[in-house]
Amino acid sequence: MPRDDDLRQHIAQQLSSFEPREATGDPLREAAVCVVIAHRADEPVVLMEKRAPSLRAHAGQFALPGGRIDAGETPQEAALRELHEELGIAASADAVLGRLDDFATRSGYLIRPFVVWAGDVLDEVVLNPAEVAVLHEITLPQLDAEPRFVEQRGLGEPVFQWPFEDYWIHAPTAAILHQFREVVLHGRSTRVAHFEQPKFAWK
């Protein structure tokens, strides 16, 4: 896998060949998230948060930087604003390399994911303790792990899970990361919007 400027160009090229799908149907509350690529000792990593335990919704769950889209702002503007508010990373529109598929959650949100190149910013990251408990750095070999589908009582479809360290991460976060892996690492236009979420994420 190429690194630095070559890696950035590779990711941008893979995303330019991918046609993201926008969700249709009943209107949902809109949110935007960032799949952030940064560097740790010259190794590319993707950033994933564990949400603060004090949050009213999805406390303690794994998530990508992001949040609700405010009135008057575009999804991309919202994604970059939330990235700055949660992690202190100030990224411009030029840092956005592309988009992934919209993901409609069981909790009533329509998530619009953007892929953002952050580069050498990890030493400058400042976690917002009101929103973020822990920041995880996912290496590309870790990202390239095989997921699994697990039956859950009361659901018609198996739940999608992706392995990270000692955890199993669920959709929507796992689904978005899996699609990033498929598109960027393997050049596959794998769709993930149908991946089921566990019941605890429905609230």
Give the positions of each predicted feature.
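N-terminal leader/linker segments that precede catalytic domains of diphosphate-processing enzymes
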Residues: 1-63, 67-85, 89-124, 161-203
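NUDIX/MutT-family hydrolases
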Residues: 127-167, 199
